[in-house]
Amino acid sequence: MFDIGFGELLLVMVLGLIVLGPERLPVAVRTVASWIRTLRSLASTVQNELSQELKLQEFQESLKKVEKASLQNLSPELKASMDELKDAAEAMKRGYTETPSPQKSDDPKKSGDHSATVEPQSNIPLNDPEAAYDGVIEAETAVRPADSQQKPENAAVAENHNDGRHATSDEAVGNNNVKPEQSQPSAASARQPSDSR
């Protein structure tokens, strides 16, 4: 490794014995041996990691070559569909990155093309999508509790109408063991069919 012959090694040992003495020489030899062992293990670790990285890079290059070869061997129909998908993806990206321009006419009758002025709301990019989402949730929760309270009552009334008897809403509620709540009428109760007597 260091091109040290037997004579040179013997000379180093004699000098070490003279300088360090017989008591400290074995400790110094063990320390130097542990340093050499650590350096060798470090060198082998670095060498192994480099060889693994080179193998991985070669493997990735071979995969890229195979992928390119398989893409070149595709049928024209598949290539056309892939190109269409890429174009659609790019168009969607452009649609979300561009801001809407205020070039619309105020009066759709003047423009002559009514289809150009009507856009579906889902294609308009939102500046604050959470605000729009919160509004939907609030509207749904405002309607749903009233609907859920009215459904058992409506079902019981409908059953009694089908039997030929006319039942009041108190009887219908009593049949379902549901106590009526005293609350303000909601939009759902306004849609309820009225009971004709």
From Swiss-Prot:
One of its GO terms (biological process) is protein transport by the Tat complex. Its main location: membrane. It is a single-pass membrane protein. Coiled coil: none annotated. The chain crosses the membrane at residues 1-21. GO terms for cellular component: TAT protein transport complex. It comes from the Bacteria. Belongs to the TatB family. The Tat system comprises two distinct complexes: a TatABC complex, containing multiple copies of TatA, TatB and TatC subunits, and a separate TatA complex, containing only TatA subunits. Substrates initially bind to the TatABC complex, which probably triggers association of the separate TatA complex to form the active translocon. This is Sec-independent protein translocase protein TatB. The gene is tatB.
